[in-house]
């Protein structure tokens, strides 16, 4: 083995993906359109103003949507198949190359299930909403269909439309039902996310019109195109910015603490449980799958950014005195493992990244729901004002403790398995040099050590800190009610189930992950060909990699 600086040529990597398997029943179209059309009925529901009828209606629509996605998985999805399944294709605007193309593979099916599951629980979490309940549940249901569409559509232009349309409900949910600084948080959210989305549109148009002729934006077509390496690098950089905002990647993260700081509990659940996963999914779907030559050069940067996420966000979370912002920075830290896994070029590491997205979706939703439930009782988010509430809310303390242990990756919980897979996959795979792997693993371990420190100290301060007698005497601290216990219990079942038997989840996507990693490794081999192979073709221009020089790959002598 010898070290070689990443250098690529305008010769391209031509990967192929399996042909889609057509759906016998329009499961995915139904899962997208059912909640959207269901939301349109909400304004016409007779209601006395208390929102009771609307709540039950929204819960019914959300539960049926969840059952539709479960039916899609059980009836039409084969986990052993690598390629696209449940595929539906209808020509929509042929002159523009726009097609209604949906489908699911291992990259999308787990997140489709996660979306419908979290949304149903978010509706239950929104039960106390009394201010403009019709508009609130209308937005929740519309958001459900939009988020499923992001994971299910197989046309890049359609993906952009779903990505953009999903932003409006989030903006309104923040701007209308948020805290005192809700307008600032909502505006910052829309500026960051909508502004960065321009890169998705530009990349979609460039890739769809590549080569001239009739534009084609379908993923299966784009995956088999011979994009030049320079072209891939430009598209990859723009998409990394767009998806890095949503993940989020430091330093593109500043909208998230503000959004979480002002959001209500159900919106928290949708932000942490689903919205952030859109960024990780898109990095896998577009950057890693459609642009493999560029991914081979950007992957070391993803890993470095992942470490920065883990350490910076963990240190910042440690310093926060606001409960919502503390958990928000904890989310950013955990998403750093997704970046490391995506850049690992290891089936185990990439599988760990996928599992981390699902795991964090469940754990993040549970923690933010508890944040909302605690705030409803205490009317404060400052840790130093909550001391001693554990004596009056013992069940709430037990729920907080269990979910916090899941977040700090306690063995037997899903977070432990996903982070261990990312670490093991990255360290044991020999794509990168040993010194680089050791440095990255050592730095990432700092974040792992900090997580239990700030989470356990948070629990101690909230529930068993110095009692604030005036604070406790002026508040009726009611313990967790059955609805709240049910929501947390529903989230803990898969958290513990995956932690004890990870194959429940990993088998749903491992075939797709293996195929993706295999194609990306071929791109690395082509990128790191011996220099004499490059110089043999004098008509090809050299492009020096923009990745840091401290991250050389290891290749075998030919």
Swiss-Prot record:
Membrane topology type: Multi-pass membrane protein
EC number: 7.1.1.-
Enzyme class: translocase
Entry GO CC: plasma membrane-derived thylakoid membrane
Keyword Mitochondrion (UniProt): no
Highest taxon of source: Bacteria
Record-linked InterPro entries: NADH_Q_OxRdtase_chain4, NADH_Q_OxRdtase_chainM/4, NADH_UbQ_OxRdtase, ND/Mrp_TM
Pfam families: Proton_antipo_M (PF00361)
GO-annotated molecular function: NADH dehydrogenase (ubiquinone) activity; ubiquinone binding
Transmembrane segments: 25-45, 56-76, 111-131, 133-153, 157-177, 189-209, 230-250, 264-284, 298-318, 327-347, 353-373, 395-417, 438-458, 485-505
PANTHER family: NAD(P)H-QUINONE OXIDOREDUCTASE CHAIN 4, CHLOROPLASTIC (PTHR43507:SF21), NADH-UBIQUINONE OXIDOREDUCTASE CHAIN 4 (PTHR43507)
Family of this protein: Belongs to the complex I subunit 4 family.
Function (record text): NDH-1 shuttles electrons from NAD(P)H, via FMN and iron-sulfur (Fe-S) centers, to quinones in the respiratory chain. The immediate electron acceptor for the enzyme in this species is believed to be plastoquinone. Couples the redox reaction to proton translocation (for every two electrons transferred, four hydrogen ions are translocated across the cytoplasmic membrane), and thus conserves the redox energy in a proton gradient.
Protein name: NAD(P)H-quinone oxidoreductase chain 4
Native source organism of the sequence: Prochlorococcus marinus (strain MIT 9211)
Origin organism lineage: Bacteria, Bacillati, Cyanobacteriota, Cyanophyceae, Synechococcales
């Amino acid at each position: 083995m010898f070290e070689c600086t990443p250098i690529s040529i305008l010769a391209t990597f031509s990967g192929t993906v399996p042909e889609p398997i057509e759906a016998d029943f329009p499961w995915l179209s139904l899962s997208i359109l059912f909640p959207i059309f269901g939301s349109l009925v909400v304004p016409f529901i007779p209601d006395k103003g208390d929102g009771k009828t609307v709540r039950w209606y929204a819960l019914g629509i959300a539960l049926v949507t969840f059952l539709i996605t479960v039916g899609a998985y059980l009836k039409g999805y084969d986990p052993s198949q690598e390629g696209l399944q449940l595929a539906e294709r209808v020509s929509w605007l042929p002159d523009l190359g726009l097609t209604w193309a949906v489908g699911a593979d291992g990259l999308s099916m787990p997140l489709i299930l996660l979306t419908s599951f979290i949304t149903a629980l978010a509706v239950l979490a929104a039960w106390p909403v009394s201010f403009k309940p019709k508009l609130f549940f209308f937005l929740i249901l519309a958001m459900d269909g939009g988020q499923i569409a992001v994971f299910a559509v197989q046309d890049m232009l359609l993906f952009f439309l779903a990505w953009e349309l999903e932003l409006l409900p989030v903006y309104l949910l923040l701007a209308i039902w948020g805290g005192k600084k809700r307008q600032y948080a909502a505006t910052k959210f829309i500026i960051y996310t909508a502004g960065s989305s321009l890169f998705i549109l530009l990349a979609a148009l460039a890739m769809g019109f590549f080569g001239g002729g009739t534009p084609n934006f379908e993923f299966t077509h784009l995956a088999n195109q011979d994009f030049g390496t320079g072209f891939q690098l430009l598209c990859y950089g723009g998409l990394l910015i767009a998806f890095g905002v949503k993940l989020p990647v430091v330093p593109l993260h500043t909208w998230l603490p503000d959004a979480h700081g002002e959001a209500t509990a159900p919106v928290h659940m949708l932000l942490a449980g689903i919205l952030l996963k859109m960024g990780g999914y898109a990095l896998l779907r577009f950057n890693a799958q459609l642009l493999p030559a560029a991914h081979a050069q950007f992957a070391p940067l993803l890993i470095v950014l992942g470490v920065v996420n883990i350490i910076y966000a963990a240190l910042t979370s440690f310093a926060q005195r606001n409960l919502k912002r503390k958990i928000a920075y904890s989310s950013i830290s955990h998403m750093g493992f997704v970046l490391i896994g995506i850049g690992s070029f290891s089936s185990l590491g990439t599988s760990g990244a996928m599992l981390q997205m699902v795991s964090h979706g469940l754990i993040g939703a549970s923690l933010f729901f508890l944040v909302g439930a605690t705030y409803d009782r205490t009317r404060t988010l400052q840790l130093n004002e909550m001391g001693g509430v554990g004596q009056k809310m013992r069940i709430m303390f037990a729920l907080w403790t269990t979910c916090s242990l899941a977040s700090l990756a306690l063995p037997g919980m899903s977070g432990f398995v996903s982070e261990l897979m990312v670490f093991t996959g990255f360290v044991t795979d020999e794509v990168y040099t040993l010194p680089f792997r050791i440095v990255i693993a050592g730095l990432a371990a700092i974040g792992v050590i900090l997580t239990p420190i700030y989470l356990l100290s948070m629990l101690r301060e909230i529930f068993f800190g110095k009692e604030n007698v005036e604070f406790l005497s002026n508040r009726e601290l009611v313990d967790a009610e059955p609805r709240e216990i049910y929501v947390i219990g529903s989230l803990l079942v898969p958290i513990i189930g995956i932690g004890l038997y990870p194959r429940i989840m990993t088998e749903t996507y491992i075939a797709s992950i293996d195929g993706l990693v295999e194609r990306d490794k071929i791109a690395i081999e082509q990128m790191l060909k011996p220099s004499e192979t490059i110089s043999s073709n004098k008509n090809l221009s050299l492009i020096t990699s923009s990745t840091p020089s401290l991250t050389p790959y290891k290749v075998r002598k030919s």
